[in-house]
């Protein structure tokens, strides 16, 4: 039986939402909705070590938009991951608390290795059996995954 799922990826510059239907028998995802908002969550983190109030507000506003879309599709499961900007910020708990207030669940703040693994899996999911390498240069330093 197919199942609807939602995934939110909150990076340094953008927040992406995917709502999909999963066919577990064939391991196939069918996109139902895809959204992306430029929020610049990591703006200034390298200089100040903190997520700015403006960046937190932009990101929270994008997540509020996503809540409406998620509600229309009623997924059985949802997951949100947050990457380097959240991981590196001194006030990351403030971000986690805001997300929990908006979405009802806390984001998973993933390690750099997990971020690379998830990114590689997403980029290569439909290219099975082909030797590949993926380079990610945002934010610095650049990471390469094979």
Enumerate the language-model features and the residues they cover.
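Nucleotide/phosphate-binding catalytic cleft detector across ATP-hydrolyzing
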Residues: 1-10, 18-138
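Rossmann-fold dinucleotide-binding core
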Residues: 141
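Acidic, divalent-metal-coordinating active-site segment for phosphoryl/phosphodiester hydrolysis
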Residues: 144-146
